[in-house]
């Protein structure tokens, strides 16, 4: 039993890194919620969300808001390409008379075709963030 444990430990130390040496790094939002702030004289309200791509390939980022019975919050850019090892800042502008803050922002990351192998399925990654 002692020899089996030693052999297993040597195997893990020598070859264990190969199982985690190539993880897929995908983009992610830096915050879990978006806080709307007033700028300047208080007339313009804006929220900011930073997106980071630590991976080696570019991704497509699509963003929109959901909720508040038809009131639309503007998100700029709504569709953008985030390059490898870079960041992107999304700006959120609510309606001026919007008192209801029960909105959600959805950020969808669409992977490039270069990551897909012929027998694999690629699935977009979506985050749903609270706007407060």
UniProtKB/Swiss-Prot annotation:
GO terms for cellular component: outer membrane-bounded periplasmic space. InterPro entries: Ig-like_fold, PapD-like_sf, Pili_assmbl_chaperone_N. It comes from the Bacteria. One of its GO terms (biological process) is cell wall organization. This is Protein FasE. Coiled coil: none annotated. The lineage of its organism: Bacteria, Pseudomonadati, Pseudomonadota, Gammaproteobacteria, Enterobacterales. It comes from Escherichia coli.
């Amino acid at each position: 039993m002692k020899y089996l444990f030693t052999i297993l430990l040597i195997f893990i130390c020598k070859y264990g890194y190969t199982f985690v040496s190539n993880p897929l790094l995908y983009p992610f939002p830096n915050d879990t919620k978006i806080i709307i702030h007033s700028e300047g004289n208080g007339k313009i309200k804006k929220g900011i969300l930073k997106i980071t791509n630590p991976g080696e390939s570019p991704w497509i980022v699509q963003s929109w808001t959901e909720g508040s019975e038809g009131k639309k919050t503007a998100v700029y850019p709504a569709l953008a390409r985030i390059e490898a090892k870079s960041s992107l800042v999304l700006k959120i502008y609510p309606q001026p008379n919007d008192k209801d803050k029960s909105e959600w922002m959805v950020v969808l990351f669409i992977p490039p075709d270069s990551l897909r192998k012929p027998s694999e399925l690629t699935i977009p990654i979506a985050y749903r963030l609270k706007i407060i």
